[in-house]
Amino acid sequence: ANNLTVPAIFEFEQPTAVLSANAEPAKAAAALIDKDSAVEMYAGFGKNVYTAFATIGGNAVGVVATGKELCHNCVAKASRFVRLCDAFSVPVLTIVNTEGFVPSTSDDIAGGIREAARLAATYADATTAKVALIAGKAVGPVYTALAAADLKIAVKGCTISALEPSAAVSVLYKDELDASANIAAA
């Protein structure tokens, strides 16, 4: 087998779960992939990211599903998995439901910024087919990194924002905040 070989199509059973906004990563993936087809990868590492090889309609895919805030371990796990899928031309389905990267100095010192940059570069450099499904919150730079896909789909009720709410307020209402004597009341 090589990269010119036609991919195998497997027998499959339709999923029985229903995708809902803000579902846990594994449950969100289970609603989209063929029943009992998932083989989870790196299960003990980066708990807020679910990575698995699975089938959708009998076709092999790599699934990355996010939840909550992403620490440096979660980001490294997703990046490593997408690079693996890209190396073997396995299409990647990314289910985005995250409030962003963990905003902590300790996470930054542990490599959070480096891993976030690596994740963005991995998605940008990947030549395999990439589909992003926004299934909850997609806020800030993590949206830009994870939704760098060939196709983006949003579930009804999801939230997409290029800026975190606090950053958006400070940008959009800067004049009002500067003019106010009581910033908390503004």
Can you name each region flagged by the protein language model?
Residues 1-186:
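Ligand-binding clefts of soluble mixed alpha/beta catalytic domains
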